[in-house]
Amino acid sequence: MKTLATIGDNCVDIYPQLNKAFSGGNAVNVAVYCTRYGIKPGCITWVGDDDYGTKLKQDLASMGVDISHVHTKHGVTAQTQVELHDNDRVFGDYTEGVMADFALSEEDYAWLAQYDIVHAAIWGHAEDAFPQLHAAGKLTAFDVSDKWDSPLWQTLVPHLDFAFASAPQEDEALRLKMKAIVARGAGVVIVTLGENGSIAWDGVQFWRQAPEQVTVIDTMGAGDSFIAGFLCGWSAGMTLPQAMAQGTACAAQTIQYHGAW
């Protein structure tokens, strides 16, 4: 099985209604969810020298993630206020903290040499690393979320093996966008559709995966779970539809409890 590292964003999700705080963020979540499949992932991110930063590092270590490159910087750890409305999450105030200045060092790049797959997301200030990582032979994955107007769709996709995004539902406009993304150089584009499952375009055909029917407690981390399950499946030699099915199963597991993990 291939090795995987994530780079970029972390965030402590604070639920005032529950009087609880959960470690999260795309790079953090994807790394943690990969441990469900026997992978010991690495993560490069920045946390503040505050209690939330300490909590996040402890939480990651306890889940089996290599935190040797979770760097502590002077300042505040990124945090988001989250409210639950009918078991769906609604994001409130966001404080980016030390992550606002995140960048990879030369030592970080050297450390990434041991990993086969590198994943990041649009919030992580990591996109500038991907041309170099892709040129070095890494299998690259990036989540642009629902930011369909982002300039990254023009500049980043030639350096991606897997481009992830989200949308409410499948329609002709979405299919045309997906075809254009692969035409610009991405290997595969995969779009999660919430309760409508997911769809992928590999340059030859569309692949669709229905959601699993489970009792939804909290949708936090669903998309990140899908990405982790998918990438772990692909790294183990699964076909595209098999990896999508594993991503769906991973997401179904996550949405049945509060918090990302």
Curated annotation (Swiss-Prot):
One of its GO terms (molecular function) is kinase activity. Its EC number is 2.7.1.218. InterPro entries: Carboh/pur_kinase_PfkB_CS, PfkB_Carbo_kinase, PfkB_dom, Ribokinase-like. CDD domains: Fructoselysine_kinase_like (cd01940). The keyword Kinase applies. It comes from the Bacteria. Keywords: ATP-binding, Kinase, Nucleotide-binding, Transferase. Pathway: Carbohydrate metabolism; fructoselysine degradation; D-glucose 6-phosphate and lysine from fructoselysine: step 1/2. It catalyses: N(6)-(D-fructosyl)-L-lysine + ATP = N(6)-(6-phospho-D-fructosyl)-L-lysine + ADP + H(+). It holds the Pfam family PfkB. It is an enzyme of class 2 (transferase). Transmembrane segments: none annotated. Monomer. Catalyzes the ATP-dependent phosphorylation of fructoselysine to fructoselysine 6-phosphate. Functions in a fructoselysine degradation pathway that allows E.coli to grow on fructoselysine or psicoselysine. To a much lesser extenst, is also able to phosphorylate psicoselysine. Belongs to the carbohydrate kinase PfkB family. This is Fructoselysine 6-kinase. It comes from Escherichia coli O157:H7. The lineage of its organism: Bacteria, Pseudomonadati, Pseudomonadota, Gammaproteobacteria, Enterobacterales.
